[in-house]
Every structure is written in structure tokens, then in C-alpha cells.
Amino acid sequence: MQRLVAWDPACLPLPPPPPAFKSMEVANFYYEADCLAAAYGGKAAPAAPPAARPGPRPPAGELGSIGDHERAIDFSPYLEPLGAPQAPAPATATDTFEAAPPAPAPAPASSGQHHDFLSDLFSDDYGGKNCKKPAEYGYVSLGRLGAAKGALHPGCFAPLHPPPPPPPPPAELKAEPGFEPADCKRKEEAGAPGGGAGMAAGFPYALRAYLGYQAVPSGSSGSLSTSSSSSPPGTPSPADAKAPPTACYAGAAPAPSQVKSKAKKTVDKHSDEYKIRRERNNIAVRKSRDKAKMRNLETQHKVLELTAENERLQKKVEQLSRELSTLRNLFKQLPEPLLASSGHC
């Protein structure tokens, strides 16, 4: 709008009219000084400054059918078919944005040259139909933004990229209770004063390095076995992490092979105890075999009994079927009057 006013000096508004003419002013109608003379009590309206006095008016054919004392602004020659240009945003003197250089105001031109001038201006500003002009403001770097953070006020814009959120707290690490008993530490300190301290100092580090890849939530049963842990490649294996406590447990608990060897007792086959045990086992085996034979005999006897009963029932069914057939034949041979009298009875 400022550019249009600068191009056409006749568009400058006159001093504010009295309240009677405010309704006409809303409709963008402007009145000349001689029209407002009556409103100021017969006195001429205050004249505009020499720099803002209107030039020669264009003929009435260009502005359309309007009154003698009225002038309307026809924006049709100023508008491009593609759309009106957007006014650049006002630059603020803050530390957040860099003020863009103000565009030079164009010199006034005649009404016949407005269309060519605007088309050239739009082509320079927007770079053609399919090109968009970049924004006329820049953003401050991170260092400058941090230095000027205290000078920001609520009206300033916030940076595009918000600060990254704080990292989540590490998950709770849960280890097996009694993984490193106190007696093991005592044996290490008593056995090797120099080397035991180094192993005791290195073992917690290995345990922590291994536990870093096995974080379990509180309340779940966490274990350090290879089946439940999923460690990425390049991490210490569970066997390496458990090597020091295995050596420590060797004195406290025997190995599985030792347990098996202790479970097997050396028995002399020529002793009386061995003979008595063998006799008891033989007697138990004979009893179990005799019981199995008795069960087989009882089963066979029961099968024979059921087979005989089945044959007897089949014979009885055959006999009853024969009797039924004879009775049917008898009823068929009886005369009908006898059957009718027997039915009334």
C-alpha cells in the first residue's frame, strides 16, 4: 500500500472529516477541499502540504462513472493476474534476528507505465512464476544465541531446533545374591597378598562390564546365565567374567566329578554284605515276576469267563428270536372276527 501511495500522489488522504462524513470514508471515498468547505463552517479546508498536493487528475473515462467531488482508487492496473505481492515482515531491532536492508522506494511514475513497472518489479522480487524469494531474515548461530539468551523477551521467536531431551536414567542392574562371598575374598587376601588384591580389584570391573549389557527391571528375576543375556559382539563372555569366582569356589564346593566319585562306594564282592544285598534283590525280582504271572493268569481266566457268557447270551437271543417268529405266525393264522372280539375285550 505504501508503494501505491508513493506512485500516485492523488491517493494521499485529506485531513479527517467531521463525523457526518465518516461513513463515506469507510468506503474508501475521498473528498476534495471545496467539497468539505461547508463542513468547516464556510471556511476552506486546510490545504495539503506542497509535497503532497495532487497532480493533474486523469480523465473521467479511466476512473469510471463517479461524482465530481469523489475520487476512488482503481487497483486493477496495479494488480498482477498471479496475485498481489506480500509485504515483507517488519524487522525488529533484537539480537535474535538480523535486520534486512530496507528496499529502496521506487520513483513516481505515470499511470501508463504502472503495469510494466510492476511486472519488472515482480520478476525481480520473485524470480519468475515458479520461483519463490527466500525470506529476508537470518538466524543467529548457536553461540550467539546462547550469548544473547538473557536479552530475549517474550516477544522474540524461539529457535527452530529445541534442545535435545536429557538422556533417560540407566536401568536398574540386578545381580545374583552371593555371587562373590566374603570367605572367597578372605582366601584370596590370605593366599596371595599381592596378586589377590589385583584380582579382587579387576573382578568387579569385569562384573560391571558384563552387567552393563544385562539390564533387567526391578522386580524381574535377572540371571547371569548365557541363555538369558544378550551381549553384543566384542563384550566379555560370561565364562571370562565368571573365571575368578570359579577358582575361588574350588576350595569351598567340590567339582561335579568329585561329587560323583564320592557317591560311588567301593564294595567288595566277596563280603557278606554284598551277598545279602544280592539275595534280597533276587528275591524281590522273583516276587515281581510271580506277581506278573499271576496277573496274566487271572486276565486269561477272566477272558475265558466273559467269552463263555457271551456265547450263552447269544444262544438266548437266538432262542427268543425264534419264539417271537412263532408267535407272529400264530397271530397271522387267527381269524379276523376273533381278533376283533379280543380287541374289544
From Swiss-Prot:
It is found in: Nucleus; Cytoplasm. Important transcription factor regulating the expression of genes involved in immune and inflammatory responses. Also plays a significant role in adipogenesis, as well as in the gluconeogenic pathway, liver regeneration, and hematopoiesis. The consensus recognition site is 5'-T[TG]NNGNAA[TG]-3'. Its functional capacity is governed by protein interactions and post-translational protein modifications. During early embryogenesis, plays essential and redundant roles with CEBPA. InterPro entries: bZIP, bZIP_sf, C/EBP, C/EBP_chordates. GO terms for biological process: acute-phase response; brown fat cell differentiation; cellular response to amino acid stimulus; cellular response to interleukin-1; cellular response to lipopolysaccharide; defense response to bacterium; embryonic placenta development; granuloma formation. Residues 24-135 are annotated as: Required for MYC transcriptional repression. It comes from Homo sapiens (Human). The modification Phosphoserine is found at S231, S288, S325. Residues 46-67, 79-116, 157-178, 218-271 are annotated as: Disordered. Residues 47-59, 160-171 have a biased composition (Pro residues). This is CCAAT/enhancer-binding protein beta. A motif (9aaTAD) lies at residues 116-124.
